[in-house]
């Protein structure tokens, strides 16, 4: 309901998960992706549209998570419902305005793997925060030594069919309990 309001929106905020929309319902989303306006995506948005995503740019079908957001859910990198996540700010991005005032990120959700093992975040993405899986579900639990930190927040630029660049921010944390973290609220 209300998807028609996306046409006049100045920002699209997505917190979707495996939505299947009719051609008529998905049209405003595709039109927005061509608008050059910013996109803000939270947690499961990277697998928000798995079915019926009829969007093509330069003759190539667009994969929403991978192409638009910079990474799609591939697996739980942490132990699902057993680990929690400590956010680690990327040193080289300390001056980024998105990180201004962000000091402590922690959440009970686990880290998502958004690219194949042995690879990295796509080159057109700028990692802002890495997520270190912890060995439990408490703020002060130790890092899981068997799990490397993976990007959990990044920016990129998306260019749709009209050639208009759009700024994209994606954070793979974002469950309700994650937002008890003042650092994550500040980031998002």
Predicted regions and their residues:
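A short acidic/glycine-rich loop-to-helix N-cap element
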Residues: 175-185
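Acidic-and-aromatic substrate-binding clefts and catalytic sites of carbohydrate-active enzymes
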Residues: 19-23, 144-145, 179
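Aromatic-Pro/Gly-enriched surface loop or interdomain linker
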Residues: 1-10
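Catalytic beta-strand/loop cores that center a nucleophilic Ser/Cys/Thr
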Residues: 76-164
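Structural motif
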Residues: 10-15, 170
